[in-house]
Regions:
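Short glycine-rich anion-binding loops that position phosphate/pyrophosphate groups of nucleotides
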Residues: 103-105
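Acidic active-site catalytic centers that drive phospho-/nucleotidyl reactions
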Residues: 25, 49, 101, 133, ...
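Conserved catalytic-core segment of NTP-binding enzymes
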Residues: 58, 78-93, 107-212
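Primarily NTPase-proximal linker/entry elements flanking Walker-type ATP/GTP-binding cores
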Residues: 1-48, 55-78, 82-91, 97-100
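Short acidic/polar alpha-helix capping motifs at helix-coil junctions
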Residues: 22, 50-51, 109, 136
Length: 214
């Protein structure tokens, strides 16, 4: 199982984020931007969720906090146009990483956005990451199925896995959908986004089960 994130051999690496609203997608992008900025990479964000009031501003705020550039247009703009501008900018100005936010309810738009990216960078997007809220259990599984039907999801970002993590959902996603979990969000802090380590996770899950039985 491939839990690692894939990067471009040369030129910008593009990660496309999908998922319904309210699962922590934009927050995940902000945290990942922080991680790569700390590693010394040049990071660009694309505000492709142009339909939700506040989504553009939320991403712009993350850009300010982290200190990275954000490509955005006014609300109700065509998301594909935003992403096109971002991809062109990433290529021309030698960005290492481009993280693309998308609207939650427009799964049909995701493929259009992907085509825009691939036209400019043939092997991109290098990851299509589906954000799921770990606390929603079966609902998360249903969402994953819906997104997997319309677009080629390459991995899962599991958010809100802090505290008494309902971790069984990870196993369900892996078993039913054959999708690797690549990142987990463990809290609200900037560095609370971790690479998913299956072994560590299984040990944690087992400990949780043992504790419950006592």
């Amino acid at each position: 199982e491939d839990n690692a994130l894939h990067f471009a051999k040369q030129g910008p690496t593009v990660f496309l984020f999908v998922g319904v609203n309210g699962v922590g997608k934009t927050t995940t992008i902000g945290k990942l931007a922080h991680r790569y900025k700390e590693e010394g990479k040049k990071v660009l964000l694309a505000a492709g969720d142009t339909f939700r009031a506040g989504a553009i501003e939320q991403l712009a705020e993350w850009g300010r906090r982290v200190g990275v550039d954000v490509v955005k247009k006014p609300e109700q703009s065509d998301p594909a146009a935003v992403v096109y501008d971002a991809v062109v900018k990433a290529k021309q100005e030698n960005y290492d990483i481009l993280l693309v936010d998308t609207a939650g309810r427009l799964q049909n738009k995701v493929n259009q956005i992907k085509r825009v990216i691939t036209r400019e960078i043939p092997d991109a997007p290098h990851e299509v990451l589906l954000a799921l809220d770990a606390t929603t259990g079966q609902n998360a599984l249903t969402q994953a199925k819906q997104f997997k039907e319309v677009t080629d999801v390459t991995g899962i970002v599991l958010t809100k896995l802090d505290g008494t993590a309902r971790g069984g959902i990870v196993l369900a996603i892996r078993n039913e959908l054959k999708l690797p979990v690549k990142l987990v969000g463990l809290g609200e802090q900037m560095d609370d986004l971790r690479d998913f380590d299956p072994q560590e996770f299984v040990i944690g899950l087992f400990k949780g089960l043992v504790a419950k039985d006592r």
